Amino acid sequence: MDSVSFEDVAVAFTQEEWALLDPSQKNLYRDVMQEIFRNLASVGNKSEDQNIQDDFKNPGRNLSSHVVERLFEIKEGSQYGETFSQDSNLNLNKKVSTGVKPCECSVCGKVFICHSALHRHILSHIGNKLFECEECPEKLYHCKQCGKAFISLTSVDRHMVTHTSNGPYKGPVYEKPFDFPSVFQMPQSTYTGEKTYKCKHCDKAFNYSSYLREHERTHTGEKPYACKKCGKSFTFSSSLRQHERSHTGEKPYECKECGKAFSRSTYLGIHERTHTGEKPYECIKCGKAFRCSRVLRVHERTHSGEKPYECKQCGKAFKYSSNLCEHERTHTGVKPYGCKECGKSFTSSSALRSHERTHTGEKPYECKKCGKAFSCSSSLRKHERAYMW
């Protein structure tokens, strides 16, 4: 009677892949492996006393990849502890209905009833070549097509897909086809729509406990990710990575049209609309359209009269955060904008620009009635009121 173990269906990372993961992604990996383990346990021998929560305090124990096990031991030993023993493998009776589809070889198309049998078959394609690991005496499998080495048949199977054009690999647990290496990024609850992890503070629910933990920080105010340069803290690791680019100057997202680069992909997306002319965000009051949702929200305040930015010193409210910042300088006395001609300083950049026109003689604001020009818009408005009386 054939059986399938947790190792047969768990996905493994190479050392290089694992090093690229940040803490939140490692937490997600742990959650996905826990989901798979739970699904297998639910159809296995009910008498087996498997303490899943205790097992997953040490996620390295369930990794089939030898290289990743060593990473957990060496890099994160103090956090995760020892690796799993073989006793944690869960043997399942194949006659129990698991919904597993037959496993097909991506090289020759031969079909097998279980993933472990497919692994053994894969050896016929790679030549079953072994050599010693440089880190320890473990034996590694060697691909005869490209020479790459792997410790587990799971990794070999995944790797062989890169040498074929037969399309995506069909995962051993779920019916939906996947392209490695993301085969187990989403557990079954993703496809059923089930969201089992519910927030205690609001009605939101999530597929993964790691997503719930991140969301709960929006309620608690916890910001565990701190910038090493300036000390600023963030709720999410992705926000920290984006912030760090403000120190490094890194701008990895480049416009193909003009070559302008941006620190965030969202900024690039907004910029690209300057080339396409796309303005997908439309005001329902007046029909005016905008390139990004933020500008639309700011515009909508001209209709609603909303002034969400309030001064803590005097209570005066403003439509825009920039106006609040300028106003607060009237309390602090800070004048960061200095004139290069005479050295006079101002609280806002607009006030500086108006002042600079006294040096250049520029008068861009012209009265439509009489043609008289002014250096600042406020002077033009005062002049226009004279016609109203």
UniProtKB/Swiss-Prot annotation:
Q: Which family does it belong to?
A: Belongs to the krueppel C2H2-type zinc-finger protein family.
Q: Which Pfam families match?
A: KRAB, zf-C2H2, zf-H2C2_2
Which GO MF terms are attached to this record? DNA-binding transcription factor activity, RNA polymerase II-specific; RNA polymerase II cis-regulatory region sequence-specific DNA binding; zinc ion binding
**What role does it play?**
May be involved in transcriptional regulation.
For this entry, the protein name equals Zinc finger protein 670
Where are the C2H2-type Zn fingers located? 103-125, 141-163, 197-219, 225-247, 253-275, 281-303, 309-331, 337-359, 365-387
Where does this protein chiefly localize? nucleus
Q: What gene codes for this chain?
A: ZNF670
Q: Which domain of life is it from?
A: Eukaryota
Q: Where in the cell is it found?
A: Nucleus
Keywords, A to Z?
DNA-binding, Metal-binding, Nucleus, Phosphoprotein, Repeat, Transcription, Transcription regulation, Zinc, Zinc-finger
**InterPro entries in the cross-refs:** KRAB (IPR001909), KRAB_dom_sf (IPR036051), Znf_C2H2_sf (IPR036236), Znf_C2H2_type (IPR013087)
Q: Name one GO cellular component term.
A: nucleus
SMART domains given for it? Answer: KRAB, ZnF_C2H2
The record's Gene Ontology biological-process terms are:
lipid metabolic process; regulation of transcription by RNA polymerase II
Positions carrying Phosphotyrosine are: Y281
Q: Which residues form the KRAB domain?
A: 4-90
| Biological source species | Homo sapiens
